[in-house]
């Protein structure tokens, strides 16, 4: 069975060059968090356990799951994939990113606004690192 870190590396490799990817590896749990296009393309939590109450990630890959789950109690659906559906999760993430890019008249400006907003924010953005550049973006 693939580990959480193996799955995170696989997702990053498959999405390389398609979206900007920021990664945060939790220090107290076996979880990896990925945000795409400064959060405009949503986020992915990869873990071997259920998450903290109040923290909602649009996409989740949980290594102990056996089948796809969808939570619809909030404003947006949240998807829970078993590890063998990682490619489905990647396809769903890219479908959402493509939809968002079509929604914004100037996606590059929206990206810049999101980037500026995250500067100095505590939590994820304080500790995450840019691991893959997106379309037309290189990792500095």
Give residue ranges: language-model regions.
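Negatively charged, low-complexity tracts enriched in Asp/Glu with abundant Ser/Thr
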Residues: 1-40, 69-76, 80-83, 100-140
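Intrinsically disordered, low-complexity regulatory segments enriched in Ser/Thr/Pro
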Residues: 41-95
